[in-house]
Amino acid sequence: MALEIDAKNATAATGDAGGATGGKAKAKENKTNNNNNAAGEKNLVNGSSSSSAAAAAKKKGKKNRNKSPPQQDAIEAEAGAALSNGHAVNGVGDGDADAADANANVLADKPDKATAAAEEKSATPDDEAAAAVAAGDDADLDALNDIGITVNISSPGTDVLSVQLSSMELVQEIHQLLMDREETCHRTCFSLQLDNVTLDNFAELKTIEPLEQGSTIRVVEEPYTMREARIHVRHVRDLLKNLDPADAYNGIDCTSLTYLNTITQGDLLDKKRTRPDSVDCTPPDYVTPGVREPPLLPLHPNIKNAKGPQALKVLTTSAWNPPPGPRKLHGDLMYLYVVTMEDKRFHISACSKGFYINQSTDDNFNPKPDNPSHLSHSLIDLLSHISPSFRRAFQAIQKRRTMRHAFERVATPYQVYQWSAPQLEHTVDAIRAEDAFSSKLGYEEHIPGQTRDWNEELQTTRELPRKTLPERLLRERAIFKVHGDFVTAATRGAMAVIDGNVLAINPGEDAKMQMFIWNNIFFSLGFDVRDHYKELGGDHAAFVAPRYDLHGVRVYNAVDVEGLYTLGTVVIDYRGYRVTAQSIIPGILEREQEQSVVYGSIDFGKTVLSHPKYLELLRLAGKHLKILPHSVLNERDEPVELCSSVECKGIIGNDGRHYILDLLRTFPPDVNFLKLEDVQMSKDLSEMGFPIEHRHKLCCLRQELLEAFIEDRYVTFIRIAAAHLQRLNAKKQADKDLPEEQSTEKPTEQSAEKDPMEKEQDKEKEKDKEAKPNTSSTETKSAEAMVNAIREAQSNVAVSNEVQAAEVVKRACATVGSLKEKEFDFRFNPDVFSPGIRHIDGPDGGGQSLAKQKRLVQDAAEFLVLKQIPAFIKEHTAHSSPPIDGQSLTESLHSHGINVRYLGKVIKMLGQMPRMDYLHRIAILELIVRATKHIYYTYMQSTEPLHLSAAISHFLNCLLTTGPVNPAVSSEEVHKKQLRNNGGKHNKHNKSSKSQAKPQSSSSSSSSAAASTQNGGNNHNSNNSTAAAAGAASSSSASNNSSADWTLVTPRSLWQQIRKETKAYWNFELDCDSVETAGAKYGFLRISLLRAFCLKVGIQVLLREYNFESKHKPTFGDDDIVNVFPVVKHISPRATDAYNFYTTGQAKIQQGLLKEGYELISEALNLLNNVFGAMHQENGSCLRMLARLSYLLGDAGDALAIQQRAVIMSERVNGIDHPSTILEYTHLSLYSFANGHVGMSLKLLYRARYLLVLICGEDHPEVALIDSNISLILHALGEYELSLRFIEHALKLNRKYFGDKAMHVAVSYHLMARTQSCMGDFRSALSNEKETYSIYKSQMGEKHEKTRESAECLRLLTHEAVALQRKMNDIYSNGKLTSDLPPIHITPPSMGSVLEMLNTINGILFVHISQKDIVKVRSEIEKHLKTNTDENEITDALKTIVAAANNNENATETTKDEGAAAAGAAPGAGETPVQLTNGGGEETTATATATVSS
C-alpha cells in the first residue's frame, strides 16, 4: 500500500529535490519514510479507494529542481505527490503530515442544525462542494476516482513483490512502499526501472506507456553521493531506535505516545472472544471508588519494556571526517565509527558503491579496506555481517515494528508534549548532536536555495486554483503542509531566540527592544518598549496583542478573499516569554516605515491613510466578518474611509501582493471592561458590577458572540415584523366598510401609539421564553401563524400597500436596532470607542450615526452577560457532554462567544447551583491555574538559566505544598547576587538598564526600523507577563535584585499573589490562603492542579509519585524538573469540502438515513486524509462518528476496528490524558463488549476512569457513566460486591447531578436491585426497585413498557423475599428447619441482556418498529423540515416586502447583500470555519432505527 508522500520524503528517498515546497527536519522525514505506508495497511473504513488528485502535478520534479523559492507549479507537484494515496485498500494519508492546530476547537455542530448549516453553505465561498453533495452531482468525485493496476516489483535479494497501485499515483509512491516493507526497508539509494528505462519519480503511473497489468519493475541500486550516504545513515539510525519512546518524551520529530496496545496487550481485532469465567476483572486499587489522590505512575504504563532490544552500542560519524583530498579522489564520502554489542570497534568507509570496514583505528588513519573485505550497498547488511548480535536484535526490532498498529508509526501533524516523563537514558547519538548544533533545521539546507522563503510559499499555496474539487484538495493540502512546516520552524526559532542562540538585528539596543530574523522568519519579544501601548495598558496590552492579532489572521484566512494576504503568524510562550513569529513581507526591510504603509495608521489614528484596492478587498471580507465601513478624519481634517480597524495596516510588498497586518482590533471592543465616560450601563449590568476596568484596553468581543447576537436579533426582527403584518391584515379586514382614507390612516396611527407597549410586551415574552421552554407544538403554531401573516401581507403588498409594508419593516428595524431604517443590517465599527480617533458622524437614525454604532456594540456586550452566559450554564445543566478540564471548559465558553475574562462571573453563577458543582470546581481550578501562570511568567523572566530547574521546583513547592520549601541555592550565593548592582544583566531578555544602548551602525538602525514596520510599527508582539499583580520585579529598578527574587517566594506569599491576581483580573475573591484550604473548600485534587499548570506553562516533571503532604522535605527537587517546552498558538487550515460532506452526512442521519449518512461521512474522511494525511484531530472525530454509525447499523466488528483507530489517533494527536481520549476509550469498551471481549472492555473502562479521576476527581457526571458501565460488566461476570461498590458511587453522583427523579437515577436503582438480588439481599433489592418503579411511574406513566417491566421485577423480588423470610422465620421460631430450604434462584444475566443495558446507559436504544411507525416518523420529519422551510419562506417574504417598499420609494440600493447578511446571521453560515465534531462530547444520533437519549 503506497501512501501519499511529500517531496521532502522524495528528497530523502531519491535525491530528487524537485518540486518540494519544503520539508521538516530530515530526521523526522526519514523516520516517517519507514513509517508512512504502514498507515494504509488496513482499510480505514469502507474499502473504497481514496481519491487521488495528482492529475495536476504532472512531471514537475526535474523542472523545479533548482528553483528557490518554489514557484506555483512546484507547489502543485508537491501537493500532487502528497495527495496521491490509493492502492486497492484505502490509503490513509501521509505519515508526515506536518501541522495541525492543537488548539483547534473541534466544536459540536448540533445535529438539528446540521441541515441548516449544509443549506446555508450556499452563501459561502465553499458553496460548490455543498451544492454538489446536495444535488447528487458526483462529477468532481468521479474525477478523483481511478483504476487500479497490479505490478510486480523485483528487488535484489528478495522475492518478487506483487502490489496493486492507483494509476494516478506517482512513481515516488513505490519508493515509499519499498522503504516501509520489512524486507526492503533498509534500502534508500535506488532507482526503479521498467524495460531498462529509469522511471521519473514525479511521473504518474498512467502516463508511463509501457506500464500495463503484470509489468515487472526492477529495483536498481544506485551509486551513493555524500548526501545520499548521510540520508542512508540517518535512516539506519531511525530504524534502530524505532521503538524507543525517547523522542516522544522529548517532543522531537512529531512523535507522540499511545498506550492502547499496552493496555489491550496487542491488537483487539486479533483477539478471540473470551468466556466470562476466564476473565481477570479485579480493578487496580486506584480505580475503585473512594480513591483520595490517584497515583501518577499508571499514566505511562509498561515503561520498562517500551524500548526494545539494543542492536549497537555506538553508531556515530568518525573523527577522521571529512575524507582528505586523495581519498575523495578514490570515492570516499564519509567515515563512520561503530561499537557492536560484542564490544568490537570498527571504522567504516562510505563510498559511492556502498559501505566497507577500513583499517583505521582511534589513533591511526588507514582508509584501506580491511582483510577480508566485504562491500555492502546497505549499511544494515554490513553490520549484520560483522555482528551476530546486531542481526538478531535488528530482526527483533523489525518484527515488533511491523506488529505495531499503523497509526502508531505515522508522525503527528503537530508536536504533542508530555507533562510528565520517566528518567530517560541519554545515549550517544551523533545525528541528534548534529541536528542540535550543526544545521539550522536538521537537513533543510539540502532544499534548493538553502533557507526557505516562507512568505512566498505561504502565499503561493493560497493562489493555487480552487474551482474544482481536485484543485481545492491540492490547494488545501499544500496550504496545510507549508503551514505545518512554518509552525515547526517558528517554534524552533522562538526557542533559539529565548535560549540566546540567535543574533539580534539591532544588537546595540536594549535587550527588550531587540528583534530577530532567523531562517527567514521575523521574531519579536513582547515588551512595550517604545510606549506604543502606554495608553492601552503598557506591557499588559503588549502581552495580549499578539494573541488578538492571531485571532484576526484566523478569521481573515477563513474568509479567504482572493487578492488579500495575511502573514504567517505563530505565537509561542516559552520560559515565561511570549515570542511572535511572522513571515517577512518582501522588501519590508529595505524601506522606511512611512513609505511602507499605504492603508491604516501607524500611530493609533493620528495619521490615517486609505487605498482604493484595500477598500475593495476589505469590504468583501467585511461582509462576512460584519465589519462596518466608516470614515475618520486624518491629521489634515480630511475624511478617510476605512473598512477595518484603524490599526489594521496595508502594505504592498515588492511582490505586488496586498498584505494586511496588525489585526488585533478586527472585532469591536468589549465595553463591559472599558471605563468610558460616554457609555451608560444598563441597570442589570450596573448591579453586576460592570463596567470593570481591565488592566489593558484591547478587550474585544468574539466572532462567535457577534454571530449569536445577530441571529438573536434576526429572530426578534422576524417575530416583530410578522406580528405587525398580522395586526395590519386583521385591521384591514375590520375596516373594509370605512372610507379608504380613514382605513389607511387609522392603523398607522394606532400602531404608532402602540409601539412602546408592544416593545414591552416583546421583552416580557422573551423573558417568559427563557423562563420556561416552549413545547414543539407551540413553536409549530407560532411559526405557521407567522408564515400565514406574511403570505397574506405579500398578497396585499402586491395590490396597493407598499407604504404600509415599508412601515412594518421600518418599525421592526427600529425595534431591534438595525443600522438601516428599512433593512436588517447589523455590522460593527471596531473603532467606535477607540481613543484619539475622530469619527465622521452621520445623520441620526442612519447607518453612519455614531450613536447608533455605539449602541449596537453596547447591546452586543450586554447580550453576552444577560443571554449568552445563562445560555451556556443552561446548556450544561443536562450534563450531556460536560467539560472535563479547563481546556474543554474554555473551548465551550468560546463556542458561546464568552471570553475567559468573564470566568469570574460564570463561577459566581455556577456557585449558586449545587447541580453544577463539578463545573464550578473545574472553573475555579482553571482560574487558579491562569492566575498562577501570570505570576510564573514574571517569576521566570527574573531567573538565571543556571537556576531554572531549582526555581521551577521551588515554585511548584510553593504552589502545591505547605511543607518546607527551602530553595536549592546557598544563602551565600543569594547574598552575593543581592549585593551586585548589575544583577539584572544575567538574562539578556530581562535587561532594562536605562539608556545603556551603545551607538549602532546605520545599517543596524535602518533594519531595525524596517523590522518594526514588518511588525506593524507597534512591536506589538510583546512578551511581558501580566503578572504585575504579583508585585514581582518588572521595572528597571527592581531588576537589580530580580535574579534572586525567586528564592524569596513562599507558599503563603504565592497564594496571596494568586488571590490578588484573581481579584484584579477576574473580579473574583478566592476564599483560601494555601493549597490545603483551596483543595478543602473547592474540592480539587493537587495532582489535577499539577497537571493543569504544567500543560498551561510548558513544564515536564519526572514521572514518580509525589507526596504533597510531606512535612519534612520539599515535594519537588531539582531533578524532578525534566524539561520545559513551548506552548504554541497558531491557526488551523481548513478542509472545506470534507466539512461540507460531513454536515450533509449529519443531515442524512437526522432524517434516519443512516447508510447514506455513513457513506457521506466516509467520503468526508477520505477527503480529510487527502488534505491532512492520516493523523489529525478531525480525522479522529470522523472515525468516532463512523464507528458509532457502524454500531447502530449492526456491524459491531466494523465499529470496533474503526474505534480502535480513533483511540490511537486521539492519544497521539490530542494527548494520552486528553478529554477526547477518555471519551474514545469509553466508546471502545462498549464495542469491545459487543464483540465478546469482556475482559478488554473492563480494562478500557478502568483506563478511562483513571484518566478522568486524574484530571478532575471522582465527583463528575462522566464518572457516574463509567461507574455504571463497570458495575454492569462486573455484575455479568459474577463479581457482585465489586459491582455494588461502583453502582453505589454512580447512584450517588446521578442523584446529585440529575435529581432524585431523573431517568439516570432510576437506571442506577435498577442496577443496584439486580446486583443485590444476585447477592441474596432481597430486602435492599426490593427497596431499590421500588425507587425505580416510582420514578418510571411519575415520569412515564403506569402503562409505559419500562414501568411495567419494573412492576414485574418488583413482583419477582417480592416473591423471592417472602419465600426467604418465611424460611428464616421458621428457623428462628423452631431453631431448626421443618423442611428443606430451597436454593436461592440467582440466574446470572445473559450477555445479550447486559449489552442491551449497556446500550441504554450509554444512550443507545434500538427500537423495533413497524411500517406504521416508519410512516409516522417520516411525517414528523417532514413536519420538522416544513418548519425549517417556513422559516426560509419568512425570510424570503420579508425580503420581497422590503424590496417592494424600497421600489415604491425609488430606492437605489438593492437588498441582496443585506439579505445575505441576515441569512448569514446564523452560525455555520460560512463566516467562520466550524470544525467537525465535539472533541469531548457525545454525538446524538436520533433516527428511526436508533435513538440517543440524553
From Swiss-Prot:
A Pfam family hit: GSKIP_dom
Biased composition range(s): Basic and acidic residues: 733-772
Transmembrane segments: none
Predominant place of localization: cytoplasm
Annotated region (Disordered), positions in chain: 1-79, 272-295, 733-783, 969-1044, 1450-1494
Gene Ontology cellular component terms for the protein in this record: cytosol
Biological process (GO), any one: mitochondrion organization
Biased composition (Low complexity): 32-56, 993-1044, 1460-1472, 1483-1494
HAMAP family membership: CLU
Protein name as catalogued: Protein clueless
Organism (species): Drosophila grimshawi
UniProt gene name: clu
